[in-house]
Amino acid sequence: MAKESVKARNLKRQALVERYAAKRAKLKEAGDYLALDKLPKNASPVRVRNRCKITGRARGYMRKFGISRIVFREWAAQGKIPGVIKASW
């Protein structure tokens, strides 16, 4: 389980990215990299880390489901993810 402060920091970054998205796109289109450099560092989408919605784990993240591999495995075994069944051959 990730620390609450790390999760909160990532949420703050996501909010900044959303807030400055239009401005960043406009500046990039114009090629004004000096003005782009003046924006907050955390306004860049590259700084946001994909994290599990349940545990906050950063590694082993599955984009399609928004959860980590560990939570995915548990939920799949319990049948909580529709359409996912354990492979058998």
UniProtKB/Swiss-Prot annotation:
Q: Which cystines does this chain contain?
A: none
Q: What is this protein called?
A: Small ribosomal subunit protein uS14
Q: Name one Pfam family in it.
A: Ribosomal_S14
Task: Identify the domain of life.
Answer: Bacteria
Its keywords, alphabetically, are: Ribonucleoprotein, Ribosomal protein, RNA-binding, rRNA-binding
Per the entry, what this protein does is:
Binds 16S rRNA, required for the assembly of 30S particles and may also be responsible for determining the conformation of the 16S rRNA at the A site.
| Family as reported in the entry's similarity comment | Belongs to the universal ribosomal protein uS14 family.
Protein source organism: Amoebophilus asiaticus (strain 5a2)
Q: Which GO terms describe its cellular component?
A: cytoplasm; small ribosomal subunit
